[in-house]
Amino acid sequence: MTHIQPRPCQLTSPMPSGRYKPFVPHKLPDRTWPDKTLGDAPRWLSTDLRDGNQALVDPMTPARKMRMFELLVGMGYKEIEIGFPSASQTDFDFVRQVIESGIVPDDVTISVLTQAREDLIECTMQSLVGAHRATIHMYNAVAELFRRVVFNIDEKQCICLLYTSDAADDTPCV
């Protein structure tokens, strides 16, 4: 019977690891968050009502979206993204329907999505008039292909979009 020699856990390496100093952790006595643990459930935000580009051919009907909104509320969601009102009249109308129908419970925050363009921000703000509580998810796509193909803008124009968020300051209803 041949005796097999165990291999060491890690083979020696030709890399000059001795040249490098070991990691020295920073001592930050006022930093307490690493010792904290989660005691409550996280806040979940449903984005199920925003169809997105994948549904341009066959989007959800307003009636189906309304049933889904009621289902999400029934499941206990406290934050629900209900649409992209500046992207289509259908989404704008659905946002208005949700607000005007009064079906949003007091403890639920509705959310909408918009691109960071002044005209689209204004349209989005108008869709939310009368909402008890709402958030706006504003984005600015910075990927070169997305800028060029979808938005037809260059990098300089994309940077200029950063300064359009001031439009929200003029609408205190949201």
Per-segment meaning from a language model:
Residues 35-57, 137-151:
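N-terminal small/glycine-rich loop or linker at the start of catalytic domains
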Residues 67-80:
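Catalytic domains of carbohydrate-active enzymes, especially glycoside hydrolases
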